[in-house]
Regions:
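Short acidic/glycine- and proline-prone juxtamembrane loop motifs at membrane-interface regions
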Residues: 188-189
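Internal amphipathic alpha-helical segments of the cytochrome P450 catalytic fold
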Residues: 122, 172-173, 184-185
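Intramembrane catalytic core of multi-pass membrane enzymes that act on lipidic substrates
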Residues: 47-145, 149
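Transmembrane-helix motifs of polytopic, lipid-linked glycan transferases
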Residues: 30-40, 139-166, 183-184
Length: 189
């Protein structure tokens, strides 16, 4: 699994290396916020600026799309709920601790015995991702991340259409929504 992959296993092998990675993640997050704020003043209301903001957003998002989950363990719960449903266990009656290996998936133990708060469509999609992942959590994680990224893209498209209809600066809206560090770190990473 992902935890046994050499770079991850190496950095998890020592508390000092884990702390170093945590500090680098925090510094990287701050640098991303600073880059996003500094990027703002150069945005004009024209198609070239819009393309530049979208291109920059994609460049910033790509590494986050393939990195291990950061800042939240929720995505591990999504995978576990999908596995629960795929195993034929009602997630509205049972917690993910009903499936073998739930803890090794990365689910927060605090939520392990809690019934699912997610709607039926979400759970059905999570079950499909679990099935497509063929029991390999990393595949299901990536499929969940792709779905979240697709949702973020649809959100950006919708906001850009609204901005165009209202006569607003679409490049500014793209900066606020697509390039925003919250969108990148919470929807994609």
């Amino acid at each position: 699994g992902l935890r046994e992959w050499f770079p991850i296993a190496f950095f998890r092998s020592s508390p000092d290396l884990t702390r170093l990675c945590t500090m680098l993640l925090i510094v990287g997050g701050f640098l991303l916020v600073i880059a996003w704020l500094r990027f703002r003043p150069s945005i004009r209301d024209d198609d070239a600026s819009l393309r530049r903001v979208i291109r920059t957003s994609v460049i910033w998002a790509l590494p986050l799309l393939i990195c291990v989950p950061v800042f939240s363990r929720d995505i591990f719960s999504y995978v576990a709920v999908g596995r629960l449903m795929a195993a034929g266990i009602d997630p509205y009656q049972h917690g993910v601790n009903e499936i073998a290996g739930w803890y090794s998936l990365g689910v927060d133990p605090f939520w392990s015995s809690t019934e699912s708060p997610y709607g039926p469509l979400f759970i059905a999609v999570a079950a499909v991702f679990s099935w497509l992942g063929a029991g390999i959590p990393e595949y299901a994680l990536f499929l969940n991340r792709l779905a979240a990224t697709a949702g973020a893209v649809l959100m950006v498209v919708a906001f850009l259409k609204i901005a165009a209809l209202r006569g607003r600066n679409r490049a500014f809206v793209a900066w606020m929504i697509a390039a925003n560090t919250l969108t990148l770190l919470l929807f994609i990473a």
